[in-house]
Design a protein with these regions (language model features):
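Helix-loop junctions at membrane interfaces in 12-TM secondary transporters
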Residues: 16-27, 212-222
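Extracytoplasmic gate region of multi-pass secondary transporters
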Residues: 127-178, 265-272
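Helix-loop-helix hairpin linking two adjacent transmembrane segments in secondary transporters
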Residues: 53, 58-114
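Helix-to-loop junctions at the C-terminal end of transmembrane segments
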Residues: 1, 180-193
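Cytoplasmic helix-loop-helix junction between adjacent transmembrane helices
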Residues: 27-64
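C-terminal transmembrane helical hairpin of 12-TM major facilitator-type secondary transporters
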Residues: 195-237
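Symmetry-related core transmembrane helices of the 12-TM Major Facilitator Superfamily/SLC fold
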Residues: 89-108, 298-320
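C-terminal ends and interior cores of transmembrane alpha-helices
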Residues: 6-19, 203-214
Length: 336
């Protein structure tokens, strides 16, 4: 967390004062490292500090503030831009406020010890991460990340051509995700992690499909379904590792998160290529302007339904896999 603080602080200041592309690139790299280190530190901290459904509840509420921050930030940014005339560069200063607050909260605090003896050793972590279950979860994680971040990067831009307001879609999606994650523990208690993930995949598929077929006000309905679908992906994939592969420890949770981010970074350029290809096909049919952008973009969104669609199959397999697994295999070994 100390590294995260310095990476965030330096990255934010560099972002404000940078006057060239390289400076902006380094600034965003530092902020990204800060984000990654924050999650890498806090996920295992929560897993070690709580047990059972309380852990699922707190993991979901920790991840609640990722979309929650986006929702609050988008509304504040819109207010400062439209009502106060404050430019984007000047708005970046606000990022230092939560940075200083979390530094105050964490510095000097004692961290909980690992609940599982093997989770505290590198050898135990690596051995657990080479099991079929962990590798299967890693595949699922890559697809959940693409299903969440893939459409999110393009939906606002594409559907703005149909009359939908991109900032409203962003705030609606992020806000609903935050609310859903607040109640994530209750959902896990009722349907179990795999049941929640399976239901999420179904809703995400419906949401992306509606994004690809609907325009105007119906885009907001699609945003609601999509938000409810992707809300539980990330925190419950992390929680799945913590509860079902406990010996992988903090390293396992960090690796799973890294797999998700890596998959997203790999597929974003591919998705961009799909948009270019669909745009060329739509242009060949005589479409131009906003109609061209909308038709080509929605064609790409339709292609993206394949990712959450595959997850429906994988999470169904995982549901029966874990249900038929011996209870003893899932219980962590008590630390000495």
């Amino acid at each position: 967390m100390q590294f995260a603080f310095f990476a965030h602080a330096i990255g934010i200041i560099l972002l404000i004062f940078s006057g060239n592309y390289i400076g902006l690139l380094v600034a965003n790299l530092l902020i990204g490292l800060g984000n990654g280190c924050t999650e890498a530190a806090c996920n295992p901290m929560i897993a070690d500090a709580y047990e059972g459904n309380k852990m699922s509840t707190m993991l979901n509420r920790f991840h609640m503030w990722f979309p929650g921050g986006i929702a609050i930030g988008s509304l504040l940014s819109g207010l400062m831009t439209d009502s106060l005339g404050i430019l984007g560069r000047d708005q970046v200063w606000l990022l230092l406020i939560p940075t200083l607050i979390y530094a105050y909260l964490f510095f000097g605090q004692a961290w909980p010890k690992a609940k599982v003896q093997e989770a505290a050793t590198l050898g135990g972590n690596v051995k657990a991460m080479l099991t079929p279950l962990f590798l299967f979860i890693a595949v699922c994680m890559s697809l959940t990340a693409i299903s969440e971040f893939g459409p999110n990067q393009w939906v606002g831009l594409i559907l703005s051509k149909s009359g939908a307001h991109p900032m409203i879609i962003l705030a609606l999606t992020a806000g609903l995700m935050a609310v859903a994650r607040y109640f994530g523990g209750d959902m896990v208690a009722k349907f179990d992690q795999t049941g929640v993930l399976l239901g999420s995949a179904i809703l995400a598929t419906l949401g992306v499909y509606l994004f690809s077929t609907q325009t105007g006000s119906m885009a907001y309905v699609a945003a609601i379904l999509f938000a409810l679908g992707i809300a539980y992906f990330w925190p419950n994939m992390i929680g799945l590792v913590a509860t079902k592969v406990p010996k992988s420890g903090a390293l396992g949770m960090s690796i799973i998160g890294a797999v998700g981010m890596f998959a997203n970074s790999i597929f974003q350029p591919i998705i961009g290529g799909w948009i270019d290809s669909d745009r060329a096909a739509a242009s060949a049919n005589g479409l131009t302007g906003d109609e061209l952008e909308l038709v080509s973009g929605q064609a790409t969104l339709e292609t993206m339904t394949i990712f959450p669609g595959i997850l429906i199959v994988l999470f169904t397999i995982l549901y029966f896999w874990l249900r038929n697994r011996k209870t003893d295999d899932l219980e962590p070994t008590a630390a000495h």
